[in-house]
Amino acid sequence: MTGPTVLVADDQDLVRSGLEMVIAARGCEVVGTAPDGREAVRLTRELQPDVVLMDIRMPVMDGIAATRAIVADQLPTRVLVLTTYDLDSLVYDALDAGASGFLLKATPPDRLVEGIHTVAAGEALLAPSLTRRLIEEHVSRPPPYDGVPERLRVLTERELEVFGQIARGRSNDEIAEALVVSQATVKTHVNRILAKLDLSTRVQAVVLAYETGLVRPGGS
């Protein structure tokens, strides 16, 4: 069984070539490369890869605008942002645009390919440094109040359970096992949760869970 198909978008020739070799050597198929965001969008529409590895700072169209365009097309393609810049503003802009994950270019090759598989499977992926800052930011805040945050009150009790599991980074398989339901049931709940909360990806759900205080570091 072959790995996910991948499109690499980066404005540096050496980076594109290096990523292509790393990915191909570990069982994934690179179906195309793009030197800028506009070309990445065009090739994604044409080739419909499983995953786009997207740099943020590129000419013509940056990676955030390209991500937003790809997500708006409602293709099955997932976007994994891979960048040198571990800056909060860029990261949150990328996640808001609909990226399914975020990793730094310094990520070890095996971890990068693991991340490609994770995102291709529809799961959320955040670089450890971003996850740590997200936790640190919200642990310093007092809990706003007890109970269900207002934005989450559109969810049923069961959907809140599933949402909490998503926020802890658990896969559909793990959620199904924890809640003693089928994977198909979990998938249905996840799709309904994202639709009700107007979210595009699971990674946006993780961020929202911390922002609303539903999930607190070290707690439930």
Whereabouts are the PLM-identified features?
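Acidic catalytic/metal-coordinating carboxylates
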Residues: 36-39, 60-65
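Active-site residues of response regulator receiver
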Residues: 10, 55, 83
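Active-site beta3 strand of CheY-like receiver
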Residues: 47-53
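Basic, Lys/Arg-enriched C-terminal extension of HTH/homeodomain DNA-binding domains
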Residues: 194-220
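The feature encodes the CheY-like receiver
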Residues: 15, 33, 54, 59
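Short, flexible helix-to-coil linker/hinge segments that flank and couple to helix-turn-helix
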Residues: 90-96, 101, 106-157, 161, ...
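Recognition helix of helix-turn-helix DNA-binding domains
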Residues: 169-204
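Short amphipathic alpha-helix used as the core "switch/output" element in two-component signaling
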Residues: 42, 64-76
